[in-house]
Amino acid sequence: MDNLNDALEKLKLTGTECTSDKLDGCLDCLLQALGHNNTESSEKIQQSGILQLFASILNSQSSCASKVAHIVAEIAKNELMRIPCVEADLIPPLVQLLHSKDQEVLLQTGRALGNICYDNHEGRRTVDQEGGAQIVVDHLRSRCTLTDPSSEKLMTVFCGMLMNYSSENDSLQTQLIQMGVIPILVDLLAVHSQNTALTEMCLVAFGNLAELESSKEQFAATNVAEVIVKLFKKQTEHEKREVIFEVLAPLAENDAIKMQLVEAGLVECLLDIVQQTVNSEKDDDVAELKTSSDLMVLLLLGDESMQKLFEGGKGSVFQRVLSWLPSNNHQLQLAGALAIANFARNDGNCIHMVDSEIVQKLLDLLDRHVEDGNVTVQHAALSALRNLAIPVVNKAKMLSAGVTEEVLKFLPSEMPPVQFKLLGTLRMLIDAQAEAAEQLGKNEKLVERLVEWCEAKDHAGVMGESNRLLSALIRHSKSKDVIRTTVQSGGIKHLVTMATSEHVIMQNEALVALGLIAALELQAAERDLESAKLVEVLHRLLSDERSAPEIKYNSMVLICAVMGSEPLHKEVQKLAFLDVVSKLRSHENKTVAQQASLTEQKFTVQS
């Protein structure tokens, strides 16, 4: 430490006038001290006021510039020294040194700027103002194909500098993307795949940029998928594969890149990893199994990539995924069910899968998770069943297979995601299936649970689906028994509330169901309709200019129907319905205008 003090004193006394040899000796002493104890030595250097002298030496383009840059790089490893480096105006001369032709000067300058920028807003801002990032990007572009060790080392440092400069800063990352850094990084990865340090630095830089939506198009315009999959296939260590996974996940959110990754053979790699890790209990293997199967499911979210892997239901990938359903591994069961749900995004696939008896595999899986089951697996399997039930031709087949009976086993579930999918599955199954709708609609336990969930204000999705299923049971069954069960369970008020929904489709479903109630069982429901203020709601819907034509039409049909009830008729007479309906006779929609004329006639006859 005495040597350090002596060197600092000499530098202070002689400054830039010191001979080159003496200056070199003092700087060597500083480097030695920093290597021995960075924290203490860097603080002593700052306290001595020498940092300002460094700015002068760097500005003078002295032959000692690379050594000074090296010292700054070492000092800036210390978090507390980064702001002092900015305040000593070291960044402008360092950025100027980036124009040097000397490899060592560039290396130490890149290190110094990278370390100053690490988690340091002021440092980044100054480098940005001085145009440092553009110079570094240009260096990488011009040197990309050089494979000598010193060039690769320099490019590794420059990639690290850009990473520290832009990390967790969207505007600086966007700036780098606009400078064209993405194709450069992809080329670096392709050319230097044998260089571990440079490869890892490129991947970390990818990871930073891939999160940005604006980066996805640029990545898609390169051969990034081919390059990364090629690199991925070479990796045998967990840690290195994990770094690549961290890049793949955000990239695979883009549909074009999904397809590129599938074509580059990523799925086969993922399936191999699943096979290697499925029976292992090691933490690393368990984590890698999850990451691989999750990524596999993500690739299936793209329509094009999903169809390519489905291959008309004959694809080897599709068959492998099916084999995950009966597995004893919860993660594979989950991924298998989610994959089926993704394959079931078009009618053709759904029809093929139902004909291939996949429904039974899903029912068997659900049956294993009824008692204290895995909620995520329940949710995924129900999602798959819901999607499979969408095509009309599948509904009867799925009902015959016992899907409703299995789904109803989850009625006691207190988990909103499971409740939501359960409701959606039942609603899809009974669409235009009168017998099934009647059977379910007479199930008091189900209807009571629906009424309970119609009040689940903390879970809008569950509340909305409950209302829709309640309405669907009536609309598709057209059954007096179903209506009576709904009345007894207290469901009428929820259908009236549903008629005021912000979603036109829900409003309409409610009005049609209420119309059937009024036509088939008005007497049984009139008290509930009155206390739910149905007539006021209908008056509001007809008066509101924003109401859709079908809402106005069905509201008028319903008004005509409820006039058969004395108390409801009185409610109608209290409100100025005739004025509202008369105005609708000139409505631009002919069906609405015709119904307005009919309704007006009914009012005239019955008033």
UniProtKB/Swiss-Prot annotation:
One of its GO terms (cellular component) is cytosol. The keyword Iron does not apply. InterPro entries: ARM-like, ARM-type_fold, Armadillo, RAP1GDS1. Transmembrane segments: none annotated. One of its GO terms (molecular function) is small GTPase binding. GO terms for biological process: positive regulation of GTPase activity; small GTPase-mediated signal transduction. SUPFAM superfamilies: ARM repeat. Its main location: cytoplasm. ARM repeats lie at residues 79-118, 170-211, 347-390, 391-431, 479-519. Pfam families: Arm (PF00514). It is found in: Cytoplasm, Cytosol; Endoplasmic reticulum; Mitochondrion. Keywords: Cytoplasm, Endoplasmic reticulum, GTPase activation, Mitochondrion, Repeat. Stimulates GDP/GTP exchange reaction of a group of small GTP-binding proteins (G proteins) including Rap1a/Rap1b, RhoA, RhoB and KRas, by stimulating the dissociation of GDP from and the subsequent binding of GTP to each small G protein. Interacts with ralB. Probably interacts with the post-translationally isoprenylated (geranyl-geranylation) forms of ral proteins. Interacts with both GDP-bound and GTP-bound forms of ralA, but interaction is much stronger with ralA-GDP. This is Rap1 GTPase-GDP dissociation stimulator 1-B. It comes from Xenopus laevis.
